[in-house]
Amino acid sequence: MTEPQSQAPLDADPEGYAPSVARRLAFYQRAGGIVTPIMTAVVAFLMGGIVVLSTGHNPWRTYKAIFEGSGLNWFFHVGSHSIHVPFTGTHVWFWWDTNTNHTAAYNLTQTLLTTTPLILTGLAVAFAFRCGLFNIGGQGQYLMGTIVGVYIGSRFTDMAHLPHVLFALTCAALAGALWGAIAGFLKATVGAHEVITTIMLNWIALWIGSYLFGRDGPLQNHFNKAVPISDDIAENAKLPTLWGNPHLQALHVGIFIAVGGLIAFYLILNRTTLGYEVRAVGFNPEAARYGGISVARNFILAMAISGLFAGLAGGIDILGWQFRLGVLDVQVSNIGFIGIAVALLGRNTAVGVGLAALLFGGLLTGTSTRSLDPEVFPPQLAGNLALMIQALVLLFVGADVLVLTIWSSRKKIGLGRRNAPPAPEGAAT
């Protein structure tokens, strides 16, 4: 009896084996230390600086303005300040000025608000990667979380504050999980590629939101039928704020939920049986199947958990600062797509995703028109710079996949190894 052939290892000669893009990327991300992502970010910013220079502006001044616009310079403003102790009337000494009238403090608040959903959408992509799946559907899962979150948040107005918040967040997370599980189920049962199905689900989620909150839609605002927007969520469904003016997008407790997501991501993958099975399937699904692990079950669970992270991000944004959802919000949002760059730059690890999310959060806030001096860098170029750096990160991280594809396809285009010429007659063998 011959043993079933298992899939070749990911670092094997690719001449006879070409793993999926997702599995190859996941393997690449696990290999090596922190040097590669750091170099990826540095090179991306250097090339961005070349573009800035080509427009006639000073790259150093531009990046300095972006850094200050992100509010991260707040940590350098050390002095003698005080901070209010919650639930008391006392103040204690603190290193930094927490008054959000201070420009750096306000900008930092905006950076952290942007970082919060990026952490969760980054985890949504990273968790699927660890199972060898490429979750392009973080955007659709995020949108489903926002749709369900705004619906629950604007209803059940008689509920107490904490139960209402927990109920809305739970429903938003479950909506994202269901949306992700659909792609996982199709992958597990009929072999439908998750990239195709998640892209399709992104569009379905977008048009569901556009219909529900559009003109004469079933969930359009009851008091203003001229505006394609949802009802505002109830006051008792809003997340508690930690820092800043609640009417000016104050920092809310969602940042702690996102950090909790990072911890949960690490514990699930490294301290549970489920995590072991997910990683085993990600390394080699055939070997995992031979070892008694249900590959189909893990495909579904991995995509469901990925969707849960993204749906939770949508619920947090709605309950934390957005408070309503319009057709324009649905159609222009790209938080889920940025999560792909966050996961790749963070090498699909909890710490890496957290740091990458902070980097992109600061970049997006720092390049916003409210943060940049037009004389330093024109607003019309600022947003494009942020998009270009995201694209460069994806390009550099995925470059090895291109090399692998060319290498494994060289025979098809006539570039394979040439057979050795036959030995002359009478030659020694």
Where are these regions (language model features)?
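Single transmembrane alpha-helix segments in multi-pass membrane proteins
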Residues: 50-57, 61, 65, 72-156, ...
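Short loop segments and helix-boundary regions at transmembrane helix junctions
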Residues: 25-35, 55, 128-138, 159-233, ...
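Cytoplasmic juxtamembrane regions at transmembrane-helix boundaries
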Residues: 126-146, 269, 274-277, 372-376, ...
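Helix-loop-helix "hairpin" substructures at the membrane interface of multi-pass membrane proteins
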Residues: 178, 246-325, 350-351, 355, ...
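Hydrophobic core segments of alpha-helical transmembrane domains in multi-pass membrane transport
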Residues: 36-53, 118-125, 146, 150-152, ...
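Transmembrane helix-bundle core of multi-pass membrane transporters
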Residues: 69-72, 78-85, 198, 202-271, ...
